[in-house]
Amino acid sequence: MAEKRNIFLVGPMGAGKSTIGRHLAQMLHLEFHDSDQEIESRTGADIAWVFDVEGEEGFRNRETQVVADLTEKQGIVLATGGGSIQSKEIRNNLSARGIVVYLETTIDKQVARTQRDKRRPLLQVDDPREVLENLAEVRNPLYEEIADVIVKTDEQSAKVVANQIIEQLGF
């Protein structure tokens, strides 16, 4: 596995992809990228605005392009958006261009970690738990399908999880 120098983090909202990714990149002396932040940088607007103006399809099109561009880089850690996994093109790019690490977490942890975050358009509903459960049903099999490594993030700090990833990858 060590021949692939890119590490791509996938998983649901609230799994810790961005936080763990920053630690991982720092520990491995790699560049860190977050696909959502890159979309915001390119559009000059936040994700919620892109969803409002362009809808989910417009956002997903932007996400596909951003992930395609970022996965062509070498020596990066990339935190992907939770829904990016639903794109076959993104799954193919992630699998072909790096090591895919699935950060697995429970619905309870997702709810706890995302409940105050107003920047998550899909969760701005009366029952975010139901949304997260429905998303998990669709997305979890896709995360598992492309994962080279699966790491649970529920009860551990981001730094501990980053260390576990490094150990599992043999870096």
From Swiss-Prot:
Pathway participation: Metabolic intermediate biosynthesis; chorismate biosynthesis; chorismate from D-erythrose 4-phosphate and phosphoenolpyruvate: step 5/7
EC numbers, comma separated: 2.7.1.71
GO biological process, any: chorismate biosynthetic process
Residues that hold substrate according to the record: 36, 60, 82, 139
Broad class of the protein's primary localization: cytoplasm
A GO term, aspect molecular function: magnesium ion binding
Catalytic reaction list: shikimate + ATP = 3-phosphoshikimate + ADP + H(+)
Pfam families in alphabetical order: SKI (PF01202)
Required cofactor(s): Mg(2+)
Keyword terms: Amino-acid biosynthesis, Aromatic amino acid biosynthesis, ATP-binding, Cytoplasm, Kinase, Magnesium, Metal-binding, Nucleotide-binding, Transferase
Entry annotated with the keyword Hydrolase: no
Subcellular localization(s) per the UniProt record: Cytoplasm
Catalytic EC class: transferase
Protein's job: Catalyzes the specific phosphorylation of the 3-hydroxyl group of shikimic acid using ATP as a cosubstrate.
Record-stated family: Belongs to the shikimate kinase family.
Family annotation (HAMAP family): Shikimate_kinase
PANTHER family linked: SHIKIMATE KINASE, SHIKIMATE KINASE 1, CHLOROPLASTIC
Name of the protein: Shikimate kinase
Gene assigned in the entry: aroK
